[in-house]
């Protein structure tokens, strides 16, 4: 496929999210979701995304890679997102497993987990830039402004292993009650 004009990959497939079908961030009305946790979107291997992402409109940005309801039958391995203008990778629901992910220099969060994502993440390296970046990981269920609320199911519950995080500084601390939405 021709990827020369792609600013961001938006994967959307048939895996249950909250509610079952939703519009995915960064799209023009495309919906994602479904009820097949083992659904396959194919394979995404040996990919480097760099200098991508932008704000489509306030509160709706393109990530380096957006996974919208992607199932565990999808193979995602050996991926790097470098200097993205929003999140490195964001998961909106789904059960996709990701191995060997490198995130460097994201302007916002490096890993953003929402809407009941229940996949596995293994062998992940995150390096924040010194002058930008928000959270290394932002993980919540459903944002507080959503009509479906905090306690929606499925709940975000990823399994993570073999992570290395390199932060830009140690001066920032957060009160979880002030900085979370799920």
Language model segments and positions:
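Single conserved hydrophobic/aromatic residue that forms the stacking wall/gate
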Residues: 1-7, 11-14, 172-182
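Glycine-rich beta-solenoid repeat tracts in large extracellular/virion proteins
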Residues: 9-12, 33-37, 56-57, 63-69, ...
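Short, charged, low-hydrophobicity "junction" segments
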Residues: 5, 15-28, 99-100, 129-143
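Right-handed parallel beta-helix
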Residues: 41-51, 72-83, 95-107, 118-133, ...
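Parallel beta-helix/beta-solenoid
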Residues: 5-53, 72, 154-166
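Internal hydrophobic scaffold segments of catalytic domains
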Residues: 5-8, 112-127, 180
């Amino acid at each position: 496929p021709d990827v020369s004009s792609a600013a961001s990959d938006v994967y959307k497939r048939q895996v249950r999210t909250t509610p079952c079908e939703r519009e995915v961030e960064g799209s023009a009305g495309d919906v994602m979701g479904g009820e097949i946790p083992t659904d396959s979107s194919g394979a995404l291997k040996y990919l480097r995304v760099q200098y991508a992402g932008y704000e489509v409109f306030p509160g709706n940005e393109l990530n380096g890679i957006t996974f919208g309801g992607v199932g565990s039958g999808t193979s995602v391995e050996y991926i790097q997102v470098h200097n993205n203008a929003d999140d490195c990778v964001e998961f909106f629901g789904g059960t996709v497993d990701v191995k060997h992910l490198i995130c460097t220099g994201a302007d916002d969060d490096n890993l953003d987990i929402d809407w009941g994502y229940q996949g596995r993440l293994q062998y992940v390296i995150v390096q924040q830039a010194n002058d930008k970046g928000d959270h290394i990981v932002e993980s919540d269920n459903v944002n507080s402004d959503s009509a479906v609320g905090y306690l929606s199911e499925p709940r975000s519950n990823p399994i993570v292993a073999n992570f290395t995080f390199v932060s830009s500084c140690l001066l920032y601390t957060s009160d979880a009650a002030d900085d979370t939405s799920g």
